[in-house]
């Protein structure tokens, strides 16, 4: 099976570097499936999971809070603002953050409060989507 080099990095660390058969991510125009030999592409990443399919048939899932995806025919690079291995996401903490954001939105005192609450809600929704992907993978 054909492979391509994949690097998933954040400001803080490199989360993955190696050969993959496919990468699936949400770009500015929607979900993208990147295979070896894909046409060159640069796009902004949306909040949510990135799925990296490995040669051995397993899958790595990483949550990203945005960033840039660069695709060359045999190399794909994810430069994420924040990236967390899906296995390291804390569902209880995310649910608590969502609850706090909902309370902030309900008690907003300014447009700034509203914007911060909506951003936090979007981030927690994307993190919970990433956790769901892991749970579906386990079944």
From Swiss-Prot:
The keyword Cell membrane appears for this protein: yes
Subcellular location, record wording: Cell inner membrane
Gene3D superfamilies in alphabetical order: ATP synthase delta/epsilon subunit, C-terminal domain, F0F1 ATP synthase delta/epsilon subunit, N-terminal
UniProtKB keywords: ATP synthesis, Cell inner membrane, Cell membrane, CF(1), Hydrogen ion transport, Ion transport, Membrane, Transport
One term under GO cellular component: proton-transporting ATP synthase complex
InterPro entries: ATP_F1_dsu/esu_C_sf (IPR036794), ATP_synth_F1_dsu/esu (IPR001469), ATP_synth_F1_dsu/esu_N (IPR020546), ATPsynth_dsu/esu_N (IPR036771)
HAMAP family assigned to the protein according to its UniProt record, in alphabetical order: ATP_synth_epsil_bac
Assembly and interaction partners: F-type ATPases have 2 components, CF(1) - the catalytic core - and CF(0) - the membrane proton channel. CF(1) has five subunits: alpha(3), beta(3), gamma(1), delta(1), epsilon(1). CF(0) has three main subunits: a, b and c.
Function statement: Produces ATP from ADP in the presence of a proton gradient across the membrane.
This protein's name: ATP synthase epsilon chain
This protein's encoding gene: atpC
